[in-house]
C-alpha cells in the first residue's frame, strides 16, 4: 500500500521500525498522510507525551502553558436566565478554560445574577473581569491537586451518606434529616460537572492526561462511574422527598425492618462496586452484580406486598423501594465499568 494512503481513518494502526542514528539517538518516521493532514512541515515541532499506560502519543499541536481555550457566549436583552445557564454549564463541562459572556448592549442584572450563581455552583470558574457589557469567567482550579479520582471518591462518600440518611429519615419520619439530604444533591451535581470538565480537558489535550497521571480509558471509566453515582444521589433525594408523602403515618415495625435491610444492602453493594472500580477487581465486581440481582428480587417482592396497602403510605413506600432498587442497578453499572477497566488495562 502506498504510504500516502495509509492512516486515513482514526484508529488505524501501522508498524514502524526504530532506526538508530549516531551513538544514542533513536528515530521513528511519521506517516506522510498524517503530516499533511496535521498541516506540518519540515522543521515544525510536535509534542511527545507518555500516558499512564506507557503509550507514547504524538500531538501536532504543542500546548503552551499560557494558552487558554476561550469560549464566547453572546447575550441580548431577549436572552433568558435558563438559556444562559444551560450555555454556561455546557461550556464548563466541555472543558473551556475561559468563558466570556458578551452583551449586545448592557448585560441585564438578571443575567449577571445567573452568571454569579453559576460561578458559585461550580468548581474553578471565577469572575476575573467585568464591565457593562462583558463578564469573563476563568478557571482557577488546581486540576492536578483535585483530580477526577479524588472527586469520584468524594462523590461516593456523599451519595452513600445521602442514601443511608434518606432511608433513616423515612423510618423516623424525620423531615429535618430529609431536608439535609435534599440540600446536598446540588453538591454532588457540582462534583459530577467537574469530572465531566476534566474528562473533556483530557480529550482535548492528551498532555493533560499525562499531567493528571491517567489514561483515556481510566478517564472514560471515571466519567461513567461519576454519572452513576450522581444518579444514586438523585434517588437518595427522591427517597428523602417521600417523607413528605408519608406525612405523620406510622408504618409497622416489620415493614420498617425490611426497608432498613433493603437500604443497607443497597449501600453495601454501592460500597463494594466503587471498591472494585478503584482496585480494578473483576471478581469483586462480579460479586456486586450477582448481589444486585438478589436485591432486585427482594425489592420486587417487597413492592408487591406494599401495593396491597392503600393510601399515601403505600405510594410513599413504593417510591422508596423503587429508588433503592434503582440504586442497586446503578451500583451494578459501576461494577460493570470496573470489569471493563480491569480487562482493558
Residue ranges and their predicted role:
Residues 4-18, 23-25, 29-345:
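Cytosolic, long alpha-helical scaffolding segments
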Residues 1:
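Iron-sulfur (Fe-S) cluster-binding modules
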Amino acid at each position: 500500500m502506498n504510504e500516502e494512503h495509509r492512516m486515513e481513518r482514526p484508529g488505524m494502526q501501522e508498524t514502524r521500525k526504530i532506526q538508530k542514528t549516531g551513538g544514542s539517538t533513536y528515530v521513528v518516521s511519521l506517516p506522510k498522510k498524517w503530516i499533511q493532514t496535521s498541516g506540518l512541515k519540515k522543521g515544525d515541532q510536535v509534542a511527545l507525551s507518555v500516558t499512564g499506560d506507557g503509550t507514547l502519543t504524538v500531538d501536532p499541536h504543542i500546548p503552551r502553558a499560557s494558552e487558554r481555550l476561550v469560549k464566547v457566549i453572546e447575550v441580548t436583552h431577549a436572552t433568558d436566565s435558563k438559556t444562559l445557564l444551560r450555555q454556561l454549564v455546557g461550556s464548563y463541562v466541555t472543558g473551556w478554560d475561559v468563558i466570556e459572556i458578551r452583551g449586545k448592549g448592557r448585560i441585564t442584572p438578571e443575567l449577571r445574577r445567573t452568571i454569579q450563581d453559576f460561578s458559585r455552583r461550580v468548581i474553578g470558574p471565577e469572575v476575573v473581569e467585568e464591565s457593562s457589557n462583558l463578564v469573563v469567567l476563568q478557571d482557577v482550579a488546581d486540576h492536578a491537586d483535585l483530580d477526577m479520582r479524588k472527586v469520584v471518591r468524594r462523590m461516593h462518600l456523599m451519595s452513600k451518606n445521602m442514601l443511608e440518611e434518606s432511608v433513616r429519615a423515612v423510618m423516623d419520619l424525620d423531615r429535618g434529616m430529609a431536608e439535609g439530604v435534599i440540600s446536598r444533591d446540588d453538591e454532588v451535581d457540582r462534583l459530577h460537572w467537574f469530572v465531566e470538565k476534566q474528562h473533556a480537558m483530557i480529550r482535548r489535550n492528551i498532555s493533560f492526561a499525562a499531567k493528571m497521571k491517567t489514561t483515556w480509558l481510566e478517564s472514560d471509566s471515571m466519567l461513567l462511574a461519576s454519572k452513576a453515582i450522581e444518579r444514586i444521589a438523585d434517588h437518595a433525594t427522591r427517597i428523602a422527598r417521600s417523607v413528605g408523602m408519608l406525612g405523620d403515618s406510622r408504618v409497622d415495625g416489620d415493614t420498617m425492618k425490611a426497608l432498613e435491610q433493603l437500604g443497607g444492602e443497597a449501600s453495601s453493594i454501592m460500597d463494594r462496586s466503587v471498591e472494585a472500580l478503584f482496585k480494578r477487581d473483576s471478581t469483586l465486581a462480579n460479586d456486586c452484580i450477582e448481589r444486585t440481582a438478589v436485591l432486585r428480587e427482594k425489592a420486587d417482592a417487597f413492592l408487591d406486598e406494599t401495593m396491597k396497602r392503600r393510601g399515601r403510605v403505600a405510594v410513599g413506600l413504593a417510591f422508596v423501594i423503587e429508588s433503592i432498587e434503582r440504586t442497586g442497578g446503578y451500583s451494578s453499572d459501576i461494577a460493570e465499568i470496573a470489569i471493563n477497566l480491569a480487562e482493558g488495562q
